[in-house]
From Swiss-Prot:
[2Fe-2S] cluster binds at residues 91, 96, 102. GO terms for biological process: negative regulation of DNA-templated transcription. PROSITE patterns: HTH_RRF2_1, HTH_RRF2_2. Residues 2-129 form the HTH rrf2-type domain. Keywords: 2Fe-2S, DNA-binding, Iron, Iron-sulfur, Metal-binding, Repressor, Transcription, Transcription regulation. InterPro entries: TR_Rrf2-type_CS, Tscrpt_reg_Rrf2, Tscrpt_rep_HTH_NsrR, WH-like_DNA-bd_sf, WH_DNA-bd_sf. SUPFAM superfamilies: Winged helix' DNA-binding domain. Residues 28-51 bind DNA. GO terms for cellular component: cytosol. It comes from Escherichia fergusonii (strain ATCC 35469 / DSM 13698 / CCUG 18766 / IAM 14443 / JCM 21226 / LMG 7866 / NBRC 102419 / NCTC 12128 / CDC 0568-73). NCBIfam families: PRK11014.1, rrf2_super. HAMAP family: HTH_type_NsrR. The keyword Transport does not apply. This is HTH-type transcriptional repressor NsrR.
């Protein structure tokens, strides 16, 4: 299973914010500069993360974005569920004549659930805390 770039960059944005000193705000422009992704794409990602409560956006002169909850409270599986369309096959009976007897969708559904359950074992904090090589790559100290 390959995650979409939307989910990939959503996770990267959260990793960047979690790597910053506690309470430090960043900007969408700063995140896009770090990862080389388009600003428009990142705005859409941050908006969805904000609606889900993972990111807090503050407007104004001293505004910016930061994590909306502690990194230890953000499970990676939950973020993927929020950002990723998880339908692996299109099982519409008008497109596939074996749909009434097909067991593939059930098998794939179980595989996706196993994937997400494994990701639920990790929090954002698990990915960033005391990760000096990551901080150096992100130029965060």
């Amino acid at each position: 299973m390959q995650l979409t770039s939307f989910t990939d960059y959503g996770l990267r944005a959260l990793i960047y914010m979690a790597s910053l000193p506690e309470g430090r705000m960043t900007s969408i422009s700063e995140v896009t500069d770090v990862y080389g992704v388009s600003r428009n794409h990142m705005v859409k990602i941050i908006n969805q993360l904000s609606r889900a409560g993972y990111v807090t956006a503050v407007r104004g002169k001293n505004g910016g974005i930061r994590l909306g909850k502690p990194a230890s409270a953000i499970r990676i599986g939950d973020v993927v569920r929020e950002l990723e369309p998880l339908s692996l096959v299109n099982c519409s009976s008008e497109f596939c004549h074996i749909t009434p007897a097909c067991r593939l969708k059930q098998a794939l559904s179980k595989a996706v659930q196993s994937f997400l359950m494994e990701l639920d074992n990790y929090t954002l904090a698990d990915l960033v805390e005391e990760n000096q090589p990551l901080y150096k790559l992100l130029l965060v100290e």
